[in-house]
């Protein structure tokens, strides 16, 4: 489909996202699909009767496939729910160990020798467990600043749960009491139009109740007054800054149509995709395999996968390079033959009395074959 009306482009997404009402968004998508379906019916009408009948049978086969796929998704959802319940006791045990609520049996001898050390005696559980796990993931580490680390050491646990109405999932970040904000629970909910595709409707985060002067998503700039100014005080200015805690204030689409253009719509779409990527990474990678991210084992696993992909790419590139080199050699040979023949047919220079040879217009800037490598 090459026509503008046939493509579901950024402007279509923008017009859909402008409606905060979920039903309105779904209807906008349905209308678009109905329009496309109408265009497909036009295609069928242009087919010969025999071919049209064959396509109709193919559509019947597709319908049966879709019924099986629907059943698969239902059973998969039930299976995921079943195993999520089986995971939960393990997550509870992990929480107790990480936060020092329970002690593991069989402590190593060298740890017992350090019991007299005051610092070791004070440390319970696994300090900075979640901070380290998050920092070891490339997607999440890009969001964490040095200032954020002071607050993230108070992170006790991360959980997630499904949301049934509207469909989606919610992340829960449990914090110990800390000097940065009053909240002990920060949440981030993703509302989806379709979980299987997935199509994100919107994201909602907790408003953080910062203590005075402790906000990590803003920085205060002080500007010195001009020299000679009487009773002048430093000018203070507050600016937004990069922080992991911006995650709880997701990008919002303006209500007014006039407040957004196509360029801004594309920017918002990219921000929403990035935001969803962070949330899904925490849900699918960090929470289930937290200790592997803490130790760094998960990094090695991902690097191994990336290296395999790179090796395949390198092999393909080498093959392509060899082919290109062969083609270049053949082209060079052809060029040399052409240039030699041109030299024989036409003089490369024209002599004028009392002057140097001058290059003709049709050969100006050409080099003889032996100069190509210079």
Curated annotation (Swiss-Prot):
A GO cellular component annotated for this chain's UniProt record is: nucleus
Q: Which residues form the propeptide?
A: 372-374
Motif position, Nuclear localization signal: 222-227
> Where is composition skewed (Basic residues) in this entry?
343-355
Name a Pfam family for this protein: NAP
**Residue ranges of the motif Nuclear export signal:** 47-62
The UniProt disruption phenotype note reads: No visible phenotype. Exhibits hyposensitive response to abscisic acid (ABA) with defects in stomata closure, and a decreased tolerance to salt stress.
Keywords, A to Z, come to: Chaperone, Coiled coil, Cytoplasm, Lipoprotein, Methylation, Nucleus, Phosphoprotein, Prenylation
Q: List the disulfide bonds.
A: none
Give the principal location in a single coarse category.
nucleus
Renumbered to this chain, the Acidic residues biased-composition regions fall at: 299-339
In terms of superkingdom, the source organism counts as Eukaryota
The leader peptide range reads none
Disordered: annotated span? 299-374
- Further facts: Triple mutant nap1;1-nap1;2-nap1;3 has no obvious visible phenotype but exhibits hypersensitivity to DNA damage after UV-radiation, affected transcription of NER related genes, slight hypersensitive response to abscisic acid (ABA) in seedling growth and impaired somatic homologous recombination.
Protein family (similarity comment): Belongs to the nucleosome assembly protein (NAP) family.
Quaternary organization: Can form homomeric and heteromeric protein complexes with NAP1;1, NAP1;2 and NAP1;4. Binds histone H2A and associates with chromatin in vivo.
Listed name of the protein: Nucleosome assembly protein 1;3
Q: Which organism is it from?
A: Arabidopsis thaliana
